[in-house]
């Protein structure tokens, strides 16, 4: 399918997607009942969307186009009420978190759709292993040139987004030692990591045409880069975050991304080049492994500081850009998370360090999501 023309969007508008865990008490393993929930919810969700993701244990919720995080919060709150009521009716529980701590990929059922069937045929067991749960944030852009500048600008802050959302230390019943183990799942996929460098929208269109011409991909949706343009929506989509344990944290991360986007497109502080990505994967690894305590290396100067320290430095630049977007409260929350070392991954590990079992952890995460 040829690349769609870039559809102009109101700048800095938001669309937020969250992939949620559908859990079956009393054992608190993943359920295979998302289709049942979605069928029951379709007529009850009036703003935003509830839909399938890869496997039957995943439930995706998505806002419509939102002006600010207040509208995002309102849409998600309304969806959450309906989802929790419906889940209770079917004796299910909903949870956040980037991974389920002890599910086995072998028992996952891929959703019934032509697209997922093709994906399963191509990638085999990797698709079932990708039963992990992420947050995606779309940011509106006026044109493709803005989108390419924003894509490269936001790529500098991928470690920040990973560290702030990290909530997947456990996988397959074991502590992985990572703050976010979710992203490691995608390392075997050929489109893992950053998008190939394109200096402008015209160059991106040519690059995509070559990919599509070789039949490697059929649409932009087949490219699961960390950040990608979505020309049909007129957005840039950030895809690296774990689903946090709470809606509040997810919304604040979206506001943080929105404020950074405003700053980037207003000030144009960087002259992007391919060499900017030289240590991208090293910085991303540090965020996945150590979260906010990970080491961030400046590709230009070689200067190093923790990701948490760099977030605090960045917040000082963003306030004047957050204010007109009604995102100041998000920056205040991000500041609090970093200063207090308040992260989902610490909360999870503290619970198990105190003797909590992994099934009890899932129960607790479900209660946190519903609170």
Curated annotation (Swiss-Prot):
Gene3D superfamilies: 3.30.590.20
UniProt organism field: Cronobacter sakazakii (strain ATCC BAA-894)
Descriptive protein name: Putative glutamate--cysteine ligase 2
UniProt keyword terms in alphabetical order: ATP-binding, Ligase, Nucleotide-binding
InterPro entries in alphabetical order: GCL_type2/YbdK_subfam, GCS2, Gln_synth/guanido_kin_cat_dom, YbdK
PANTHER family from the UniProt entry: GLUTAMATE--CYSTEINE LIGASE 2-RELATED
Catalytic reactions on record: L-cysteine + L-glutamate + ATP = gamma-L-glutamyl-L-cysteine + ADP + phosphate + H(+)
Single GO biological process annotation from the record: modified amino acid biosynthetic process
Record-linked HAMAP family: Glu_cys_ligase_2
Entry's transmembrane regions: none
Coiled-coil region(s): none
